[in-house]
């Protein structure tokens, strides 16, 4: 898959956008369904996070599409420590549905 949905600091205009900008690709506005948290927990405690849920509220963000992503997943997975990379269906503002990866908060530990 050559697409990543971002909703936090990796979005254009935010503190870590340069990470994806350096990979090179195309940005499309879109949304997923889930619960957005301004601050996560565990290793992600100081950063925004999401827990996906098909009946959850709409969480807006950006779909980053790049053929170069395959060469960068290991680096991105390490950067997103505290999150799990899972598959999601993103709806673009034009109504198109696109399969992509997203970094979701890891389950809370008991």
What are these regions (language model features)?
Residues 1-110:
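Glycine-aromatic micro-motifs
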């Amino acid at each position: 898959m050559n697409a990543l949905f971002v909703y936090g600091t990796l979005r254009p205009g935010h503190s870590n956008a340069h990470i994806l900008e350096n990979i090179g690709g195309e940005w499309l506005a879109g949304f997923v369904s889930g619960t957005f948290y301004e601050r996560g927990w565990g290793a992600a405690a100081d950063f925004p996070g999401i827990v996906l849920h098909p009946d959850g509220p709409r969480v807006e963000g950006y779909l980053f599409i790049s053929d170069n992503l395959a060469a960068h997943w290991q680096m991105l997975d390490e950067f997103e420590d505290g999150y799990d990379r899972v598959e999601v269906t993103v709806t673009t503002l034009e109504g198109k549905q696109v399969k992509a990866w997203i970094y979701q908060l890891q389950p809370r530990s008991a």
